[in-house]
């Protein structure tokens, strides 16, 4: 491991949706930089924690449930006080507006947007006491695109940008930052199978 980039030594980071894809890559990068990393997902992300090694800690978390967040805020203290929260968990079913039902709309908002509020509710108080913290929300560059069948997803991801801007202002005097990151289409298992030609064309 390259110790020259261990800029997060002594910090504890929490990454949601860390079983695979972007979340797993972020968790591994934070660990490489010296952080203790709490990795969460709907199913226990054992593989990610194992790849990290002794500084990786796996917890099961449904980001839509406030009780799960409350429980995690207590259990995570065994690892340490959380300094960095990376909200990466996402839900993105393709539905045309004609086929979009309220249950799908609400699940999309709960997963993609409510989770950011809940993480702040339960981890912001500790950051304020320590006068240091980082919130990172994984949004999407799709907020600036017109994609058929994704109105609910785009709305939720635009909401992340707005929430992070507001949160950043609320915590600016406490040594805490809040930022949204808008990645483009990323070659992960979540986007489904791709032919080699498709991969070359897109990625």
Description of each model-found segment:
Residues 91, 98-117, 132, 136, ...:
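Catalytic Tyr-X3-Lys loop
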Residues 12, 19-20:
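Conserved glycine-rich cofactor-binding loop
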Residues 96-97, 104-109, 191, 199-203:
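Substrate-binding pocket helix/loop in short-chain dehydrogenase/reductase
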Residues 140:
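Residue(s) in the substrate-gating loop at a strand-loop-helix junction
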Residues 144, 182-193:
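Short, flexible catalytic-loop segment of classical short-chain dehydrogenase/reductase
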Residues 125, 169-170:
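Alpha-helical segment proximal to the catalytic Tyr-Lys
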Residues 120, 156, 164:
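Active-site helix of classical SDR
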Residues 98, 145-151, 173-174:
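Active-site loop immediately N-terminal to the catalytic Tyr-X3-Lys motif
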């Amino acid at each position: 491991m390259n110790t020259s980039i261990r800029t997060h030594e002594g910090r504890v980071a929490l990454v949601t949706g860390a079983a695979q894809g972007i979340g797993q890559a972020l968790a591994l990068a934070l660990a490489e930089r010296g952080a203790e990393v709490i990795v969460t997902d709907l199913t226990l992300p054992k593989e990610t924690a194992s790849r990290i090694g002794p500084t990786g800690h796996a917890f099961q978390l449904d980001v839509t449930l406030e009780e799960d967040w409350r429980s995690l805020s207590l259990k995570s203290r065994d690892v340490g006080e959380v300094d960095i929260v990376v909200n990466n968990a996402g839900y993105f079913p393709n539905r045309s507006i004609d086929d979009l039902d309220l249950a799908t709309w609400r699940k999309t908002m709960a997963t993609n947007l409510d989770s950011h509020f809940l993480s702040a509710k339960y981890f912001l108080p500790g950051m304020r006491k320590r006068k240091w913290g980082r919130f990172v929300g994984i949004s999407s560059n799709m907020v600036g695109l017109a994609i058929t069948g994704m109105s609910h997803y785009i709305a939720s991801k635009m909401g992340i940008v707005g929430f992070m801007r507001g949160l950043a202002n609320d915590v600016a005097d406490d040594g805490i930052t809040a930022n949204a990151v808008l990645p483009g289409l990323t070659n992960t298992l979540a986007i489904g199978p791709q032919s080699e030609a498709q991969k070359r064309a897109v990625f």
